[in-house]
């Protein structure tokens, strides 16, 4: 089945036999099996077939607006639901599913599992889990792709974890030498949110809706249109990273290295970059390839 799945993409720039073969062998850990986790469907259909999935939640009826499940999946644990779905599409795929809520006490467990994969896609909504996974990836020098599924934009970035840049350093947490079990996550949350609250993001919700989401009165808002954009962005970023990991040269594209974040705003029809460390917006010139940087104005 795998050969049939990857057949139609051969001949697209960068999708060489060498890269497609590497994709089929790459081990991907997807942390979070909700809207962000729907990248699994994209990954499967470009040829990835070795997955580890972590989540603790169950499939609900409201998940069907963005996940490729049918009503008979409702009530199933999400990682197991994804395993069933992925292996229906490609029976040759290997899927390890963990129903587990990641907490500050899971660092050694995460290290064991992340050390056994090639790359990580981070898609959890819980800050404590994201902090811990980011820290372990940085320690193990594992590349990690991120893209907030509730941003209502195409948005993506890669923590390559090769040049000393980490989530903790860019956010200014000051936690580098603090045991994860002793971190005050509640106190750090505003700094974390600031990184991903790129210019233009809050404009995608009505003010009263934004207030209800922030207060916890309603879950984060999402829509298949925009979640799929983030999934596509993350999948493409994972493909590019797979090439780099395997020493395959990319043509006419490159990795979006954190603290740089790539954004396409479908409401305004404009693409730009956001440097989360310097709080600057970069406007690319399609003709010249140059980026002009501006300070963020409030």
What are these regions (language model features)?
Residues 19-60:
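Glycine-rich adenosine-cofactor-binding loop
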Residues 50-91:
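Glycine-rich phosphate-binding loop and adjoining beta1-alpha1-beta2 segment
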Residues 1-29, 61, 257-263, 275-276, ...:
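N-terminal charged helix/coil linker that caps or initiates catalytic domains
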Residues 116-230, 257-298:
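E1/E1-like adenylate-forming module used to activate ubiquitin-like modifiers
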Residues 42, 109, 132-136:
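A short acidic, amphipathic alpha-helical/loop segment
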Residues 79-131:
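A structured beta-alpha segment of the ubiquitous adenosine-cofactor-binding alpha/beta core
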Residues 48-49, 93, 140-143:
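A short helix->loop->beta-strand "cap" motif at the edges of active sites that frequently abuts
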Residues 230-249:
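Oxidoreductase and adenylate-handling cofactor-binding alpha/beta cores
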């Amino acid at each position: 089945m795998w050969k049939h799945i990857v057949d139609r993409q051969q001949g697209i720039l960068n999708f060489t036999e060498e890269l497609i073969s590497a994709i089929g062998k790459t081990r991907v850990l997807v942390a979070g099996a909700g809207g962000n986790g729907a990248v699994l469907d994209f990954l499967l259909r470009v040829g990835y077939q070795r997955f580890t999935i972590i989540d603790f939640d169950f499939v609900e009826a409201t998940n069907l607006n963005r996940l490729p499940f049918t009503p008979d999946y409702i009530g199933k644990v999400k990682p197991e639901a994804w395993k069933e779905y992925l292996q229906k599409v490609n029976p040759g795929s290997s899927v390890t599913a963990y129903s587990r809520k990641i907490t500050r006490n899971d660092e050694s467990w995460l290290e064991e599992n992340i050390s056994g994969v090639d790359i990580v896609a981070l898609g959890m909504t819980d800050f404590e889990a994201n902090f811990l996974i980011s820290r372990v990836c940085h320690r193990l020098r594992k590349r990690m792709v991120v893209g907030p599924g509730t941003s209502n934009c195409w948005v993506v970035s890669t923590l390559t974890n090769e040049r000393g840049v980490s989530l903790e350093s860019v956010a200014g947490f000051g936690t580098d030498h603090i045991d994860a079990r002793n971190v005050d996550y509640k106190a750090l949350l505003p700094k974390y949110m600031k990184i991903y609250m790129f210019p233009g993001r809050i404009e995608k919700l009505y003010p009263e809706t934004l207030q209800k989401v922030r207060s916890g009165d309603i879950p984060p808002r999402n829509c298949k249109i925009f979640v799929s954009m983030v999934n596509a962005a993350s999948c493409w970023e994972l493909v590019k990273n797979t090439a780099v990991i395997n020493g395959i040269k990319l043509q006419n594209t490159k990795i979006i290295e954190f603290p740089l974040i790539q954004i396409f705003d479908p409401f305004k029809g404009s693409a730009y970059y956001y440097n989360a460390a310097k709080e600057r917006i970069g406007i690319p010139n399609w003709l010249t390839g140059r980026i002009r940087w501006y300070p963020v104005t409030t």
